[in-house]
Swiss-Prot record:
Highest taxon of source: Bacteria
Listed SUPFAM superfamilies: P-loop containing nucleoside triphosphate hydrolases (SSF52540)
Gene, per the UniProt record: sulA
Binding partners and assembly: Interacts with FtsZ.
Keywords on record: Cell cycle, Cell division, DNA damage, Septation, SOS response
Protein name: Cell division inhibitor SulA
Any GO BP annotation: SOS response
Function: Component of the SOS system and an inhibitor of cell division. Accumulation of SulA causes rapid cessation of cell division and the appearance of long, non-septate filaments. In the presence of GTP, binds a polymerization-competent form of FtsZ in a 1:1 ratio, thus inhibiting FtsZ polymerization and therefore preventing it from participating in the assembly of the Z ring. This mechanism prevents the premature segregation of damaged DNA to daughter cells during cell division.
Organism for this UniProt entry: Escherichia coli O127:H6 (strain E2348/69 / EPEC)
Post-translational modification: Is rapidly cleaved and degraded by the Lon protease once DNA damage is repaired.
Amino acid sequence: MYTSGYAHRDSSFSSAASKIARVSTENTTAGLISEVVYREDQPMMTQLLLLPLLQQLGQQSRWQLWLTPQQKLSREWVQASGLPLTKVMQISQLSPCHTVESMVRALRTGNYSVVIGWLADDLTAEEHAELVDAANEGNAMGFIMRPVSASSHATRQLSGLKIHSNLYH
């Protein structure tokens, strides 16, 4: 999982996570948009990273909005995750072409502490700017969830450093 280059060009995930936590606890007037790319075969990693933040945001008086393409949140999962059942709203069966527009409208209202939407395609620069403006206006956070399959993840070149040493040869 990583946060988008749009949202955090010069920072690591840990500093981005601490910034998110600081923003949510200080209730500053800045909004935040972040893209979360995760492997479809490892959804627990995403839950482990996002749940503490969502639990903290659940303590605010505002709603949490989930814009899901097909999945329906289970009442049992919401409760077991420690999220406030009375503050979680979901709109499912939303067409991907309406997700960004719906996120912008929801973020702008200020009624939601967080708006989470699923998109398969990358955002355009214009869409990203619209989301950032809306999040700032509504003092809210928005997460673009982008699943990737394990097979497409495996075909990309891995980033890393090879250290060649003649000490071991």
